[in-house]
Structure formats: C-alpha cells, structure tokens
Amino acid sequence: MIEIKKAKPTSPGRRHVVSVKNTELHTGKPFKGLVEVKKSKAGRNNTGRITVRHQGGGHKQHYRIVDFKRNKDDITAKVERIEYDPNRSANIALVLYADGERRYIVAPKGLKKDMSVISGEKVDIAVGNCMPLRNIPLGTVIHNIEMKPKKGAQMIRSAGTFAQLVGKDNAYAIIRLRSGEMRRVLLDCRAVIGVVSNSEHNLKSLGKAGAKRWRGIRPTVRGVAMNPVDHPHGGGEGRTSGGRHPVTPWGIPTKGYKTRRNKRSNKLIVQKRK
C-alpha cells in the first residue's frame, strides 16, 4: 500500500516535506550476496580534480547488483520481497530461481511478494516477464529495453517510466518513448513487460537542503554570485544580470541550447522527441 504524507509545519525544515511510504517494501538489510562496496568519489577523477560538480558527502551506500540481462531462460523465479534501492529511483525485487540462485531485478508496477516471473524466447505476456521484442505483441507497454542484443537493458529503467511497442519492420521493432521519440531497436533485443515501479517518486519533496546533502548532492552556486576567475557571469560592482546570454562555466550556451552530439545510433531514430 502506498501512503503519500505531507508533514505538518512544525519547523521550517518540515514545512514542505512530502514523503511517499510503501508499506510493502522490505524493512531489513539487503541480501548480502548481491551487494558490493560503493566507494564515494565526491565527483573527483583519479587525479583528484572535480569532473562532476555538486557531488560529495552523503550517507554511505552499498551498490545492489541488479540483473539487467535477464538471461536465465525458462526457469521460474519467485519474488521473495520488494526492496528500496538508494542507487535508483525504482524499487528492486529479490527473486529466487527454481535452481536456488537469487538475483535482484528492477521491480515493475504490480509485482508483489510470492508472484512468479520468467524470461525466455516464448513466455507468457505477463508483468515482469522478459522476452525478445519479436515475440511481444504490438501495443504492449514495456520497460528495461536492450539497445544491443545480450548487452543488458539500457533504456526505460527509471521509476514510473515505460515505452510502447508500436511496430515491427524487417529486423527492427519500433518503440515510442515517453519523450515522444520513436526509435528502432533490433527485434532480438529483450524487454520486460509492464511499467517500472514507484511511479509516485515524482510526488516526493525533500523539504530542506539537508535532505539533499544526505543523498550526496552539494549546493549549486549561481555564476553571477562568483568572481570573474570562476565563471563567465562572475564579477561586477553590486548585483549584475551577467551581462551576456546564459552560459555554462566553460562558456557554452545553456538554457535550451542543444549539445547532443551526432551518434551512429541517430539513424535508428524514426521521429525526434517533442
């Protein structure tokens, strides 16, 4: 059961908090055999320089090893529990295969404890089942989509997201993404049936800066508040508007300027996003 709770304004830090509580989530520790140490990099590379801004601090986390390939074919897996994962917006499910192996998978919406999932070439069209796109009927809602066969899911993995299979053309399937983009994907690529879980994730409000810091997210300082040495918008006597069109700290236009490079996979885009 999902509970959306707005905190009472007992303090400035509680006034804007909106929390989403799922009573079906496992409250204990993760399965020990499927976690590994996640070392905090604080946005630095191997030379110690900041390569990703606004990262650092936060609570220690363990990385949950999630199975994105779903390559254990024709063996039924029973859902043992649904868990919170600090490394992604979606929930994850711990599944136990009939041969005794356990794996984490991204939990789709509607998947509950004691339900079963299976992957393979020709399996039932049911929530949580994984199969090649060639065997999925048109109009089906899918997630966890591979971009290359056997590489593992790379698209549609965030909370509440989904794509729709709208066509099949020779060796390719045509899928419609949430952005409105229509894209061709090889029919041998796999996908999972259903919508990704935790669709209420966007309703959550952290309410205070400290909650961001717990997650390892540091403040974003405006360029106009910096010195000229630090940002193209910096400097000036008194408050200024920057004096030029908005740019990044490296002088590249921002606020709507498209920076996506042309890739070889561009030819697979049938219709650009809206």
Curated annotation (Swiss-Prot):
| Cystine crosslinks | none
Q: Which InterPro entries match?
A: NA-bd_OB-fold (IPR012340), Rib_uL2_dom2 (IPR014722), Ribosomal_uL2 (IPR002171), Ribosomal_uL2_bac/org-type (IPR005880), Ribosomal_uL2_C (IPR022669), Ribosomal_uL2_CS (IPR022671), Ribosomal_uL2_dom3 (IPR014726), Ribosomal_uL2_RNA-bd_dom (IPR022666)
Q: Which GO terms describe its molecular function?
A: rRNA binding; structural constituent of ribosome; transferase activity
Alphabetical list of PROSITE patterns matching this protein? RIBOSOMAL_L2 (PS00467)
Is the Secreted keyword given for this protein?
Answer: no
The answer, when asked if Nucleotide-binding is one of the entry's keywords, is: no
Q: What biological-process terms (Gene Ontology) are attached?
A: cytoplasmic translation
Q: What is this protein called?
A: Large ribosomal subunit protein uL2
